[in-house]
């Protein structure tokens, strides 16, 4: 895929932009930022907050539900009544009464990137849907230099390491972003500066993230030890030329290698046992 509208400009996609707290940082890192957010109320807030950047054509706000479906015009979206960060595209299974169902315009991954151009960095943070969008993105041969996704599902890491062909990784812990990355040195399009990331923002990406890049095996062992949760997995390809090439047919072997190791790990076995005991106790209580 090549950009049809923005040439070789550096484009960042903020997929799951929420209230736009990541946008100021991304504007410092790119020529254009595409903020994708389904919640229309949050989009209105961003339009007011970043009116100047929108007018300068540095920021585009896409009010749509990003989906992996090929043909879609309108899709249901579930807005949490009190915590907007919990709003989601898949129908909620936990306390659905806390959500308001609305129908919003849908857009596919292909449509989004075809309209705005090839990405330099993609942040994916869509509640319970990161791995679906990531798979669609990689299946369409979209492999930006830098990419990140939230690790509530191990499939995010596995897809990056197999189908994505990425071989260098870092982790950003969401709970510590505001403290760890306060007055943090970052590189921008105009040089180096110090920046403080707000609470509940995604934090830095790429070379701005603390620590050395590690290989897939090292990161996998960290996830086995520390578990998943509120943390973003960041990835890049050490050899950018190889990133442009499609992964070999052996990527499926790599996928199942990590998938099965995760499923049979002691932590996952313990989790399944706890789940079984919890369900059993609920049945006993109900009589």
Which residues does each predicted region cover?
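A short acidic-Thr-Gly-centered motif at the start of a beta-strand
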Residues: 1-5, 111-114
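SAM cofactor-binding core of SAM-dependent methyltransferases
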Residues: 2-72, 151-153
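Conserved acidic-Pro-Pro-aromatic motif
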Residues: 10, 22, 29-32, 111-283
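Conserved phosphate-coordination/catalytic loops
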Residues: 14-17, 100-107, 128
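Residue-level signal for well-ordered alpha-helical positions
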Residues: 49, 89-92, 136-137
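A short helix-to-beta-strand connector/capping loop
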Residues: 53-60, 99-100, 118, 143
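Glycine-rich adenosyl-binding loop in Rossmann-like folds that engage adenosine-containing cofactors
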Residues: 67-111, 116, 184-185, 189-200
